[in-house]
Regions:
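Acidic, Ser/Thr
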Residues: 4-10, 120-129
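Surface-exposed, short loops/turns at beta-strand junctions within beta-sandwich domains
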Residues: 42-58, 157-166
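Edge beta-strands of extracellular beta-sandwich domains
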Residues: 70-82, 179-187
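Conserved structural position at the C-terminal beta-strand
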Residues: 63-65, 173-175
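Solvent-exposed serine/threonine-rich low-complexity stretches and specific carbohydrate-binding patches
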Residues: 18-44, 139-155
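Short, compositionally biased P/S/T/A/G/V-rich stretches that sit at domain boundaries
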Residues: 1, 84-113
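Hydrophobic beta-strand segments within extracellular beta-sandwich modules
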Residues: 59-61, 169-171
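Solvent-exposed loop segments of extracellular immunoglobulin-like
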Residues: 13-15, 131-136
Length: 187
């Protein structure tokens, strides 16, 4: 919530209060004579759309003062808009994509050390609040592997892995703001 405090120099003055961020402007109130507040949740999507590649952006609150219909003057103050609760979301699964080892185990969820080929699949990937998806990576045994994204899905071909016991894999989805969604799975 933003609250704009008025300090009227005359009881005949009224004010128009406008929020500006990038190319977006929103009139908070006209004919204002006292303090006025704005619940920014009402316009959050429009604000987020102005900063698809950043988690914060400087804007302003502009107050134009009138005496009747005559403009007395305009003053403004800077504000900083912040992106919150906007880490990308996704689902993740893994499989052994080596048909020969799957034929031995009978289950692509079982990994044979130094033989199975680990493939990690991402689905339902979504960037939030006007961001776009940028990259996906997985860390296995301390090694990072970069995958490819195609819309809301992605694939990370890790390859043959040297794991002899249950191993935690960290999968990270990064958006255009640098925000990260992280999921952990055990293979």
């Amino acid at each position: 919530t933003i609250t704009v405090h008025m300090n009227r120099k005359s009881t005949v003055f009224t004010h128009t209060v406008v929020l500006k961020l990038g190319s977006y402007s929103y009139t908070i109130g006209t004919g204002v004579t006292d303090n006025i507040s704005l619940d920014t949740d009402r316009i959050a999507s429009s604000l987020y759309a102005q900063m698809p590649n950043s988690n914060e952006m400087t804007g302003e609150i502009a107050v134009t003062t009138y005496s009747g219909s005559t403009v007395i003057g305009t003053s403004s103050c800077a504000i900083i808009a912040h992106v919150v609760n906007s880490n990308p979301t996704f689902d993740v699964a893994y499989e052994d994509s080596n048909s020969k080892t799957v034929a031995i185990t009978g289950d692509n969820q079982h990994i044979i050390r130094n033989n199975s080929t680990l493939k990690i699949s991402v689905s339902n990937a979504q960037a939030l609040n006007s961001a776009t998806l940028k990259s996906i990576t997985a860390v296995v045994n301390g090694n990072a592997y970069t995958g490819s994204l195609n819309g809301s899905t992605g694939t990370i071909n890790v390859g043959v892995v040297n794991v002899s016991h249950d191993t935690e894999v960290t999968v990270k989805l990064t958006d255009s703001r640098g925000n990260e969604g992280i999921r952990k799975i055990t293979v």
